[in-house]
Amino acid sequence: MSPKQTPFSEIIQALADENRPFPAASLRRFSDLEPADLRSLLDEWPRIKTGRKRKLLADLWSLLEVDTVVSFDELARPLLKDPDAQVRALAIRLLGECEDHKLVPTYLDMLIRDESADVRAAAATVLGLFMDLGELEEIPAALYHKVEDALIAVVKGGDTVEIRQRALESLGYSSREEVAELIEQACARIDPVWVACALFAMGRSGLERWSDEVLTRLNDDHAIVRLAAIKAAGELDIKEARPLLLRMLEEGENDADVFEAVIWSLSQIGGEDVRIYLTELLDQAEDDELAALIEEALANL
């Protein structure tokens, strides 16, 4: 009997059974749960071991990253109130593309009051979605500014460095001048992680004002900074970056993440010379994953 035909009650039993690995083929059964199935799962949830719950949600998140059809929103919503911090953080990540602005008050409360730094960091990240929606005027203006104010307060406040960095990245969508000042301050720091966060925010801003800074950072000694600058160059469609990015392809970048980012950013910037280089690179590719990325980049031109 296939997982699709298995009664959901048996799926729940399999999840609760610590003596056997939960079958990966059953993960998709948690997508778009029917109300009755969700109620049954939530009734059993407190009796399922914490490790099994964490593993399930982590596996669902991994599936979500590669499968654009599945949605675990219905499961994740009630788990935002789970007593386990890892479960709460994973629930936020599962809701990473859910545009329901009714979630915002919960996220703001978690950002400010949750005892777990991981949860606060996840909340800071997911609020970036609503910064983007706010700039597009797709959520109420008052709610958008409430998110903006909260994130600015976090960046300026005394929370952990990681949470402040995630908040700055989410603020990248904001057009408020105060945010631009925060980005400039972060970029002026010695810490390369702060600089990378600033560049990430610049890429999200869509503002030409950051082009010179991004171009300068393409040659940075730190891979994390180069990676962020390369991505920002693509997001901002900086034509002047094209020769340097093409040279990176020619010379071969040792860092795989940086090399892949160069390919994608060039696909965003475009140009016939980019098509020629990527086509040649595809012909030489021996790695299937790299070849798939290049094909996707060519399609994006």
Report residues per predicted region.
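Extended alpha-solenoid helical-repeat scaffolds
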Residues: 27-32, 61, 67, 78, ...
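Amphipathic alpha-helical scaffolding segments comprising HEAT/armadillo-like alpha-solenoid repeats
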Residues: 2-10, 33-45, 66-81, 100-113, ...
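Alpha-helix N-cap/helix-start positions at coil->helix boundaries
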Residues: 20, 35, 50-54, 85-86, ...
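Residue-level signature of alpha-solenoid helical repeat scaffolds
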Residues: 58, 93, 125-129, 169, ...
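Alpha-solenoid HEAT/ARM repeat scaffold
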Residues: 21-24, 54, 58, 89-90, ...
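Eukaryotic acidic, Ser/Thr-rich intrinsically disordered low-complexity regions
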Residues: 271, 279-301
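HEAT-repeat alpha-solenoid elements in large eukaryotic scaffold proteins
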Residues: 11-20, 46, 50-58, 122-133
